Amino acid sequence: MSFVFIIMGIVWVIGFFLLSTQCSQKWKDIPEKKFLNYLFFSALGLRVFWVVFSYIYYTLNTGIPFEFSAGDSLWYYEESIGNRDSSISSIWNYLFVDTTTVSDSGYVFYLSLLSKIFGENILYPRLVNACFSATTVVLLYKLAKRNIGEEGGRIAAIFACFMPNLIFYNGLHLKESLMLFLIVAYLERADNLLRSKKYSIVSIILPAFLVLTLFTFRTVLGAAAVFAFVTALVFTNTSVIGNKKRFMLISWGVLAAFTLTGGTIVNEVDGYLEDRETNVENKRNTQTAKGNQWAKYATGTVMAPMMFVLPFPTMVDVDEQYNQQMISGGNYVRNFLGGFVLIAVFSALFITKNWRNLSFIGSFVFAYLGIVSVSGFSNSERFLLPGLPVLLIMAAYGITLLNAKNYRFIKIWYWIVPVMAVAWAYFKLGSRGLF
């Protein structure tokens, strides 16, 4: 890996742990309103800085303000600029009626609307995304507080504020920042609906609208969101969801499922699941053709059990993987926090046995990461990213559960993480015949 990316990775790691530790101590007892102000503006400041920095960095290194080997981001930009002079109804028909796929249509529609306001400017849409990303951190706090308590909620939100992977995508013209906002907004509103004693038309329509929007960003995300909602209805304790409310919401869920059945959305999800073996095989063949002779061992069956820890950091200087090298520090942080996630999962299932009250967010991350892990994208940071907000909540919960017994596991985990990183680098080098 180049010296620049090594330094960048070190800054990501040290910055995350230093800022998270200091802010967790300083902000733990301040009033909630003050905490949320600190949280939002800290998150916004970091993201705006990264937007400007990455704009300059990419322009100097690639000649354009887009990432290395830009593909999707350039397509999104060109599509939105092409739609700029069209009417909103024409853009809608083009994206949602004339095209055969729903996934990605939502983000192109969003960028097309921004292009009507900002023209061909590249920086302004990214700054808007930075605002959405900072809002995501606040929504994550509300979701986490409701599920794991005030202490865990603050830790999870602080993690999200300084998490490198959640900052990184604000500097790109990709859908990830807005998609993460929609995910957390849906989870927060749907969780509120499930736990509230009273509900209104608006409280039902808003999460329904958000989940439909998720289908237009990544179809499997929408499917995982619906699955999580139904799972929570079935398994959550009656003290949280009354039987009458459970019946009404299940009826609504069944009606929504029938509405979606037979449409383009379900066809795309079915196709994604049916093609999972093809995805794995094609990826394996591609890697083998590039000289990766060990690719056959990186199957979904092998990688799926590690879905709470993946992806591993890329420390090997491989052509066309510069973006992965830039975010390697963030992946290392994810690997480290995975130890606390494992404590949280084990505790919820076998010690505190409160998994029913965590079934909504838990089933979402299990469903989504499970599908991705067996579909040929098990170490793809970008595909695993949508599960990160919930993993941060689980990691924060694991930290609140620390005691002398499980801390012994974490001390061992301190050594496991760097060993896994080196082993992955060894795998990549050896598979290419470089030693």
Question: Where do the model's predicted regions map?
Answer:
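Membrane-interface helix-loop-helix junctions at transmembrane boundaries of multi-pass membrane enzymes
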Residues: 146, 196-202, 322, 344-365
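Membrane-interface alpha helices of multi-pass inner-membrane proteins
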Residues: 168, 194, 202-225
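Transmembrane-helix motifs of polytopic, lipid-linked glycan transferases
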Residues: 18-25, 127-147, 340-347
